[in-house]
Amino acid sequence: MRQHSPTRRGLLFLLLAGVASGQNAPDVAKLATDTSKESQACIACHMKGATPLAVQQWSTSRHAQKGIGCFECHQADKGRPDAFEHFGESISVMVTPNSCGMCHGQEAQEFQASHHAQAGQILGSLDNVLGDDVEGPAAAAMGCAKCHGSVVKVLGQGKLDPGTWPNEGIGRINPDGSKGSCSVCHSRHTFSLSIARQPESCGYCHLGPDHPQAEIYDESKHGVTYRALIGQMNLNSASWVLGKDYSVAPTCDTCHMGATSKLAATHDVGARISWNLRPEVAIKQKDWEKKREEMKSVCANCHASDWVNNFYTQFDNAVDLGNEKFFKPAKEIMTKLQQAGKISPTPFDAPIKWTYFELWHHQGRRARMGASMNGPDYVQWHGFYEVAKIFYSEFLPEAEHLLPGVTSGVKESSYHQWMKGLSPEQRQKIREYYQKRYEQPPS
């Protein structure tokens, strides 16, 4: 523990006791005296009126218990673009992965190598054109960038461009050259382990029509069991090893990042993911076999090998079905339309481009992601049903209208033979089923 003069400790205690709420005041005061003199000055001032609750939140954190205060995280070299002088100290309002990495070196290194850290690299993508150009910069700043991250710009004297800050996007590009934001998961200023481990934290970004992992998890047996038995999850434990510290259910953290008896915890969230389900046509990841074996080893803590292997067979079959039946043919048709001069290279300037975008970007992803996480309704009604509906009733007719004959190859494929009609025997079988089940024939 650092040593401070009795006078400083006494004054600090009286100050904090006068401004903090009841039972919290002695704790804040005592914890503050265990920090550096720079952090003590921060705490004394901020408790008087500038963000007092941030100080109280900090007082409940492990940082506070270890004597890690404001200055240790917010200090910044004078040459750093976003640094400014504040009561004689060089600081930044931004705490970046480089800042956290001073103590959490391995975690910061793993994170910088992860897909999360690259989430801000969407310049030139369709998503970026849609957000910045079609919708508009203000929408992109409050929408896309809040998850993907902004390129934070410095106006000078430590002031940050309001068009790019505040921002906690997971792939934020920081003035110090680092990428990402640790606090998007490890919320300020409690830095709570339990918050970071809860699926709701991941659901800040992983939800909605194009990446509904949070909703899929809630539907799955994993999510149902987690919610029912959350009191047994031991979420705030410093050690969190599957089978040792908890066993009743997995969270997002468990499968993608968590420690097991055979695997160390990692901050590279893609280390166990074998498919990239995001693009128009899903593709296997680099080193996908190794990644899959690591994920299987997590599954094996609860499931027999046949169950795990058969699940992956079903999952692969669903992804392959989407690729071969819908997404590859649709992409080929879009290429032919552009080559024939029927559509321009400009995104979103024709109805069929919106149809195609939603086909793979919304419905297609939902089907694939539902399959990956055991969410049957997202595979079926929110997924392949919507894919089929748009493909057959919107996309193919729109393409055929623009370039007659462009869909003929698709219709001849064995995947689409149903379009030629059912046999009399098939129709009769359906009629008999509906008559027996509902006492009425199908329309």
Which sequence ranges carry the predicted segments?
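Bacterial N-terminal signal peptides that target proteins for export
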Residues: 1-11
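Short sequence/structural segments immediately N-terminal
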Residues: 22-443
